[in-house]
Amino acid sequence: RQMCIRDRSMTVYPALVEEGNTVKEGRFSTPAEAEYQHRRALQRLLMQQLAESAKFLRSKLPGQTELGLLYRELGRVESLVEDILLASLDSCILEGEATLPRDGAGLASLAERKRGALTEHAEKLAKLTLDILKLWHGLQKRFKGKIDLAQAVALNDIKQQLSHLVYPGFVRETPAQWLKELPRYLKAIEMRLEKLPGQVQKDRVWSAELAGLWAQYQARAAKHAQEGKRDPQLELYRWWLEEYRVSLFGQQLGTKVPISDKRLSKQWSLVDA
């Protein structure tokens, strides 16, 4: 859709956009951003359309007491359960659709056709979330108490890594295909900590390399955010950085894709400027 702004013609992309628990109409400068916002808004509308199912799951979703205890430092269990439900609505109903519904009737018929598996999706995601939080909680304990100064560089790198893997809202923010890999990433951190006393120097070299790669990613991500861009190649690079960490610190766990510094560099060349 063309619009004139200050005598300049520009193309804008209409989409629904989430606003609290409701949605409104919005316009975006790129189709990727419009698609992303529209999809999140549809999750919210599905929560309203399938209100009975959502209410049932809020009260019956297994493991909520334990989830609440493990998530306590990050937020309220109610928020976590909402995120699990929204992400489950996405994976159960919206995932795999070539085009997303643009009207209420289209969304209603899609929901009716695919809602049968919602409980299964939500229970599976709750279990994955519990596994992730147990591993995360175990790692948090390692930072309490006296820290060996020789290991400080590695521990700072790990803390920073963890803050970008597990944070308030991570269940909904992390793409489903990568969320299921989080337990492996966290186990690789455990292995790194176990080996650390015997390879402090080696670890320091890797930490420096990873810090450079991450800074490069963050700078580009910030630039894209400012421009309203969403680049799938940059997102892929971000998760390949986690795979690269596994290849350095937890080789026995294996990687989802063959990975090396050369492959990372090649992927970076595909990222939008």
Residue ranges and their predicted role:
Residues 1-5:
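Short, small-residue-biased leader/transition segments that mark boundaries at the very start
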Residues 139, 146-273:
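C-terminal amphipathic alpha-helical interaction region
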Residues 6, 10-147:
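Noncatalytic, helix-rich "gating/capping" subdomain that lines the substrate-entry/channel surface
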